[in-house]
């Protein structure tokens, strides 16, 4: 008897909690529900695609800057990490862009980057840096290392230094002396004429002192 009583009690509780079926909508319309489901799924897929696109874009823009060692590939800074399947328009654009890049590579470079850093400009056709292998000069072992010494009998002898020019000075001939005397006389006449013309001009002779009174 106790079991039948408890079963009746559970049934009465279930009946009291379940809402009454309204009389207006007897059965739900299957076409209306499927339309709502389709609209909701479409909205969700559009928002998910938008979100994915935004995530992709931010991922491309916020990639970390490379270290100094990898600055050679700066063109890949804003490119995606994974290669997406390219359509024919992308391939055409890549070909168009590559044609310009190849043209730029074919043009001769004005100078090397080392020249831009050092300020050195090299003529066209010459290397910007001298190859040390081509600059090896054969040193003559017999010549002394220092210009202050002369090799005399296999021994180094200190050279006498003088400021005189070692070129051979020839003594002037009588004709050259006469020409020089003629030039000196003309020079003296010109000086005298200038002195007469300007007045207080005085040309100091040799061993003559100016005495102010």
Swiss-Prot record:
Gene Ontology annotations for the cellular component aspect, listed alphabetically = adherens junction; cell-cell junction
Q: Does the keyword S-adenosyl-L-methionine apply?
A: no
Tissue specificity of this protein: Blastoderm. Throughout the entire cortex of the embryo although the distribution is not uniform.
Annotated GO biological processes are: cell-cell junction assembly; cellularization; cleavage furrow formation; morphogenesis of embryonic epithelium; regulation of cell shape
Q: Which UniProt keywords apply?
A: Developmental protein
Question: Its biological function?
Answer: Actin-myosin network stability during cellularization. Might be involved in increasing actin-actin interactions or membrane-to-cytoskeleton attachments. nullo together with Sry-a and bnk may provide auxiliary functions, by acting both to stabilize a large and dynamic microfilament structure and regulate its functions.
State the name under which the record lists this protein: Protein nullo
The organism encoding this protein is: Drosophila melanogaster (Fruit fly)
Instruction: From the UniProt record, report the name of the gene that encodes this protein.
Output: nullo
């Amino acid at each position: 008897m106790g079991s039948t009583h408890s079963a009746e009690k559970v049934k009465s509780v279930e009946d009291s909690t379940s809402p009454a079926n309204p009389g207006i909508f007897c059965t739900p319309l299957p076409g209306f529900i499927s339309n709502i489901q389709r609209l909701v799924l479409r909205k969700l897929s559009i928002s998910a695609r938008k979100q994915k696109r935004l995530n992709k874009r931010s991922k491309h823009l916020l990639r970390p800057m490379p270290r100094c060692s990898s600055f050679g590939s700066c063109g890949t800074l804003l490119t995606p990490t994974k290669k997406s399947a390219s359509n024919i328009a992308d391939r055409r654009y890549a070909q168009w862009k590559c044609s310009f890049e190849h043209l730029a590579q074919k043009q001769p470079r004005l100078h090397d980057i080392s020249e831009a850093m050092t300020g050195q400009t090299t003529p066209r056709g010459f290397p910007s840096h001298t190859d040390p292998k081509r600059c090896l000069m054969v040193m003559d072992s017999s010549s002394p290392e220092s210009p202050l010494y002369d090799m005399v009998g296999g021994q180094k002898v200190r050279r006498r230094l003088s400021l005189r020019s070692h070129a051979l000075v020839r003594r002037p001939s009588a004709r050259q002396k006469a020409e020089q005397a003629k030039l000196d006389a003309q020079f003296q006449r010109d000086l005298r004429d200038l002195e007469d013309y300007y007045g207080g001009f005085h040309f100091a002779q040799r061993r003559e002192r100016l005495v102010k009174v």
